[in-house]
């Protein structure tokens, strides 16, 4: 059961807090055999330089090893529990296969404890089941989609997201993403049936800056508030407008200026996002 709670304004930090509570989530510790140490990088690379700004601090986390390949074919797995995962917006499910192996998978919406899932070439079209796009009926809602066969799911993994299979053309399937983009994917790539869980994730409101800090996100300082040595907009006597068109700390135009290179997979886009 999902509960959306708005905190009472007992303090400025509680006034705007909106929390989403799922009473069906496991409250204990994660399964020890599928947990790895996650070292805090604080936005630094291997030479110690900051390569991603505004990262650092936050609560210590452990990484849950999630199975995105779903390559254990034709063996039924029973859902033992649904868990919270601090590393992603979706919930995860701990499943126990008939041969005794346990794995974490991204939990789809509607998957509950004691339900069964299975993956394979020809399995039932049911929530949580994984199969090649070749064998999925048109119009089916899917998630956790591979971009290359046997590489593991790379698309549609965030909370509440889904795509729809709208066509099949020679060796390719055509899927429609939430953004309106139409994309071709090889028919041999696998996908999972259903919508990703925790669709209420976007209703959360952290309420205060400290909640961002708990998540390892540091403040974003405006360029005009800095000194000239730190930013092209810095300096000046009193408040200034920056004196030029908006740029990044490295002098590259921002606010609409395109810097992204085309990906090789862009050639598979049939229709651009709206």
UniProtKB/Swiss-Prot annotation:
Q: How does it assemble?
A: Part of the 50S ribosomal subunit. Forms a bridge to the 30S subunit in the 70S ribosome.
| Cross-referenced InterPro entries | NA-bd_OB-fold, Rib_uL2_dom2, Ribosomal_uL2, Ribosomal_uL2_bac/org-type, Ribosomal_uL2_C, Ribosomal_uL2_CS, Ribosomal_uL2_dom3, Ribosomal_uL2_RNA-bd_dom
Function field: One of the primary rRNA binding proteins. Required for association of the 30S and 50S subunits to form the 70S ribosome, for tRNA binding and peptide bond formation. It has been suggested to have peptidyltransferase activity; this is somewhat controversial. Makes several contacts with the 16S rRNA in the 70S ribosome.
Q: Which family does it belong to?
A: Belongs to the universal ribosomal protein uL2 family.
- UniProt name for this protein: Large ribosomal subunit protein uL2
Q: Where is the composition biased (Basic residues)?
A: 257-274
The answer, when asked if Iron is one of the entry's keywords, is no
SUPFAM superfamilies hit by this protein: Nucleic acid-binding proteins, Translation proteins SH3-like domain
User: Does the keyword field hold Cytoplasm?
Assistant: no
Disordered as annotated region, ranges: 224-274
Task: Supply one GO CC term from the record.
Answer: large ribosomal subunit
Q: Which UniProt keywords apply?
A: Ribonucleoprotein, Ribosomal protein, RNA-binding, rRNA-binding
